[in-house]
Each structure stands twice: as C-alpha cells, then as structure tokens.
C-alpha cells in the first residue's frame, strides 16, 4: 500500500483531533468536530482550510504570455496588471478538461499557477510537453516549498490583517481575483490572493511551508476556525463551484460542465482543444437541482451518479449534498441541453423517482440564498 502524502500541517490537524481521510492520496482533515458548525463559521464569520495539497507552479521566461495563450482555454490577454488572476481550464486536444486552475500574472516573465493535487503530476508533464513542442524556452518549477491556507468568510480579511498587520496596506484595496506579494512578514514572504472556493469573501495565502504552522496557529488565536474537507464540499456546492474529477474530467468539455464562461473564443488564438470545442459545441446543460419536499419532507438526499429523468432524455447528478444554509438537498446535474430552469425532473433515489426542480447556479453567494 502506498503511503499517503502529508501537508506541512498534518501534525497540526492531528493535534486538533481532526478526522483524517485519504483524499486523492493525501492525508487530509474531513472535519475537526461538527462539519455543520465549520460550514456556518465560513458563512457567518471566518474559517480556514489547509489546501497545501494543491501545487504552486512557477513559470519564468520571455515567452511566458505566449505559452499561456496557447496552453489554456481562457485568455491571458485579460491579465494586464501585476497580481491579476484568471480561472481557466487546461484542455486536451479533444476538448476534455485536464484540470481547472488559477493563473496569476506578476510580470511579463513570471506567471504563477495553482493546480489541483490529484492532477499536479499530469499537469506538469503536459506543461513541459507543450513548452518543449512550442520551443517556448520556459523554466517550469513546481514549488512544493510552499503551503496554502484559504481563509474564508465575511470576517476573513479582517482576521488575516489582524494576524499579519503588514498585509493590510498591500491587500486592503485588492479586488476579487487579484493577488499581492507581501515581503518580510513574521511568516516569511507571502502571496495573498482574494480568491476562494466557498462563495464567500476571503484570502488564499501562499506561505513558505516552514512557516505555515505558525501562521495557522496565529490565525486560530485571532478567531479563525479550522475547517475540513466536509465543509469545503458543502460550501463549494452551495456556491456553484465545480470539483475536478467529479463534475468534469478529461472526457468532458467545459461547455458541458457549466464552464463556458471560462472559455474565450473571441481572440484569434490557437489554444489546445479549441478546434474540438468549436466542432462539438454544447451538448448538455449543467444545472442546479433542489429536491422537492412532500408534506414538508424530502424523500432522500441528492448524490453523485444518481440518474436524472427528463422529458428530453436522461442525465446524471455529478455532485450532491444536503445544504446546511438552505436546509434542502441540492445537486449539480448534467442533463439534455433542452432542459430549462424551472423544469421539474425526476431523480432516481434507491428504488423511487423523486421530483427535483431545475435552478440556476449558484445556490448561495456571500451568505445569501439565491436559488429558492
């Protein structure tokens, strides 16, 4: 049996009596007690997540912008100011999603990317292949010397500033999807991005791994609650945010995964997968579902891989859970393209067909329920 990878915070999680699970080969906390309370902390105050299993990759060289024009489906032409970030899919030639990632622009010779843990080795191999094939001459450096802590919630930024006073001046004016580099803090040189995976405001802090446990403990002392993968999943589902490997993979087009907004077909550039996307178009709708109640009760919980029956054909739930914020069972589903918001569809739960209503994503954003 292969030993699990550990983040630099593994001992800290165990000291907090976290329930640990194998998450794609990483030993990660699923909760530290009440998952519901962790979820609520992020929606109402501030919670933090160890996301150090994700991999920071630095790209340097004179042709780094040209490389990303070709490598990703979104358009790095939008990245004009230092620290600006872009969410994109990395596609294969068939238009399938190799990974979803965030690209940060710092200078014309330095871009930084954060990729998912389970796909990191595959992504890096693909980047190296594209770099070699295109003769871009870039240096591509995975940075496992970094850890990442995501601090999320309406009070997250204030609590980060209380913990790292030097960060306030550099980040108080940051708009969402922008980052700043903050040098010389007690926790080393930090990259602080106004990004997240919860539907709340907050920061994701890239920190030298040798300093992350001290930062984690300091954030806790300033009232930030440690949160595990369980709350992270219910929060991202409420927020309408995809999980790689569950809502899309290398056989699924971003156009069929609710990610058309991340694909830029306007610029005349030859990015990997473009020809396949243009040839195939959109084949399915990616929608939200809310399980309908009868006599005030739902007959089950929506879960991944349940079949969805519609008048236009069958679909499938890709992610499902019970929403703590809504007190409803919610899901994402890939269904025939003719399915519309407001339609009632049937979901096969055990041996029953139960009605669910099609809604526009997201379900919740900034603490407010949007899908009723």
UniProtKB/Swiss-Prot annotation:
Q: Which GO terms describe its cellular component?
A: cytosol; glycine cleavage complex
Q: How does it assemble?
A: The glycine cleavage system is composed of four proteins: P, T, L and H.
Q: Give the family per the record.
A: Belongs to the GcvT family.
Kind of enzyme, top EC level? Answer: transferase
This chain's protein is named: Aminomethyltransferase
What InterPro entries does UniProt report for this protein, alphabetically? GCS_T, GCS_T_bac, GCST_C, GCV_T_N, GcvT/YgfZ/DmdA, GcvT/YgfZ_C, TrmE/GcvT_dom1
Look up and give the organism this protein is from: Burkholderia orbicola (strain MC0-3)
Q: Name one GO molecular function term.
A: aminomethyltransferase activity
Function (record text): The glycine cleavage system catalyzes the degradation of glycine.
Q: List the SUPFAM superfamilies.
A: Aminomethyltransferase beta-barrel domain, Folate-binding domain
Q: Which reaction does it catalyse?
A: N(6)-[(R)-S(8)-aminomethyldihydrolipoyl]-L-lysyl-[protein] + (6S)-5,6,7,8-tetrahydrofolate = N(6)-[(R)-dihydrolipoyl]-L-lysyl-[protein] + (6R)-5,10-methylene-5,6,7,8-tetrahydrofolate + NH4(+)
């Amino acid at each position: 049996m292969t030993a699990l990878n550990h983040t630099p915070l593994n001992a800290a999680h165990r000291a907090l009596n976290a329930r640990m699970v194998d998450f794609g080969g990483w030993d990660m906390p699923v909760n530290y007690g009440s998952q519901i309370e962790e979820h609520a902390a992020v929606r109402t105050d501030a919670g933090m997540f160890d996301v150090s299993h994700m991999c920071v990759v630095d790209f340097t060289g004179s042709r780094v912008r040209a490389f990303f024009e070709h490598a990703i489906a979104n358009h790095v032409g939008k990245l004009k100011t230092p620290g600006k970030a872009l969410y994109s899919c990395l596609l294969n030639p068939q238009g399938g999603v190799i990974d979803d990632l965030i690209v940060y622009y710092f200078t014309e010779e330095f871009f930084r990317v954060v990729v998912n843990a389970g796909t990191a080795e595959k992504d890096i191999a693909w980047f190296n292949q594209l770099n070699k094939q295109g003769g871009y001459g870039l240096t591509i450096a995975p940075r496992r010397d970094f850890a990442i802590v995501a601090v999320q919630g309406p009070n997250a930024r204030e609590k980060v500033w209380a913990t790292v006073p030097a960060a306030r001046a550099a980040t108080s004016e940051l708009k969402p999807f922008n980052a700043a580099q903050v040098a010389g803090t007690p926790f080393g040189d930090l990259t602080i991005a106004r990004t997240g995976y919860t539907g709340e405001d907050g920061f994701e802090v890239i920190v030298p791994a040798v300093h992350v446990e001290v930062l984690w403990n300091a954030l806790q002392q300033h009232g930030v609650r440690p949160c595990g993968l369980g709350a992270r999943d219910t929060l991202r589902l409420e927020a309408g945010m995809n999980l790689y490997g569950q809502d899309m993979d290398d056989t699924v087009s971003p156009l069929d995964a609710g990610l058309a907004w991340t694909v830029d077909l306007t610029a005349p550039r030859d990015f990997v997968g473009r020809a396949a996307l243009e040839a195939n178009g959109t084949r399915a709708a990616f929608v939200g579902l809310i399980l309908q109640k009868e006599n005030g009760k739902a007959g089950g919980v929506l879960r991944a891989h349940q079949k969805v029956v519609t008048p236009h054909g069958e679909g499938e739930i890709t992610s499902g859970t019970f929403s703590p914020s809504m007190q409803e069972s919610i899901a994402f589903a890939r269904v025939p393209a003719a399915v519309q918001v407001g339609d009632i569809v049937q979901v096969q739960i055990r041996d029953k067909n139960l009605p669910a209503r099609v809604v526009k994503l997201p379900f919740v954003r900034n603490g407010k329920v949007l899908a009723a």
